A protein has these predicted regions:
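Short acidic/polar mixed-charge low-complexity motifs
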Residues: 28-30, 58, 70, 190
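Preference for bulky hydrophobic residues occupying beta-strand positions
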Residues: 34-36, 66, 196-198
Length: 265
């Protein structure tokens, strides 16, 4: 987030297979905790973003937008996105909106060839809380209007969440975003957790079949524990106990970094 308020404290806690950012806003009396990790032990890949908002002040109504300001769709190489951005965006599309888990992809392959080939698969973006899936805002104009730097969501700041959620969205000829819109009343010290998975899926049916499995209330917490245990399992070979715990963890991390690049011994 863009926040220049001196009364905001931000810290980062890093583990071998996950990390957490904790931001406490003493001006508006709320705390945000964001945890990232790679989903382990599943037949599909995902980057997990787990966000917990805590109200530190009196009971209040919160309007929350959490997500990504840009999603480059599947099928567009980074080099072509930078050199032919206007052409590449004309191929972009979004599907699976009816199931609240959009799939972002380029309709055709971007190769300069005589034969046009259809892309298969896309990048999914799944947001959910204890009540189920939440369809994200996918049109950046709904939030940022003409603010092309994507730093300040003008429509959200000026008109609120209801206006943004009711905006007539379009996904053709543009690079999409993905923001989950949430309105919550939180009492003192009450928190709210929003989880997001993003990754690649071969088709809509594949990711739709996984939705009930992922929506289990303990799913994210269980997977976070598994992710941390996975790193410990593969670094126990070099487990070291010295007078400095930081040095002990340095040995583990160096070992992990090396075999991820060069292979497990």
């Amino acid at each position: 987030s863009v926040n220049y308020d001196a009364k905001v404290k931000r810290t980062m806690r890093i583990k071998a297979n996950s990390f957490r950012i904790i931001e406490t806003d003493y001006t508006h009396n709320f705390k945000t905790e964001i945890t990232y990790f790679i989903l382990p032990h599943e037949p599909f890949g995902a980057l997990v973003r787990n966000v917990t908002f805590t109200n530190l002040g009196e009971e209040a109504d919160f309007e929350i937008l959490d997500g990504m300001s840009r999603i480059i769709p599947y099928g567009i190489p980074g080099t072509k996105f930078t050199t032919m951005a206007n052409l590449m965006r004309s191929y972009n599309t979004v599907s699976n909106l009816k199931n609240d888990v959009p799939l972002f992809f380029s309709r055709i392959e971007s190769d300069d060839a005589a034969e046009m080939k259809e892309n298969v698969g896309g990048y999914y973006y799944m947001c959910f809380d204890n009540n189920g899936t939440i369809c994200p805002i996918y049109d950046p104009c709904a939030l940022f209007e003409n603010e092309t730097a994507l730093q300040f969501p003008i429509n959200f700041i000026m008109h609120g969440l209801k206006f943004v959620a009711g905006y007539s969205q379009h996904f053709t000829n543009k690079i999409s975003c993905a923001f989950a819109p949430v309105a919550k009343k939180l009492s003192t010290n009450q928190n709210y957790t929003l989880s997001t998975l993003c990754g690649f899926a071969h088709n809509e049916d594949f990711i739709n079949r996984l939705i009930p499995h992922i929506l289990d209330k303990e799913y994210i917490n269980k997977k976070l524990v598994e992710a941390d245990q996975l790193a410990l399992k593969y670094t126990n070979d070099i487990a070291t106990t010295t007078g400095n715990p930081i040095l002990d963890e340095y040995f583990r991390q160096s070992y992990l970094d090396n075999f991820l690049r060069g292979g497990y011994p």
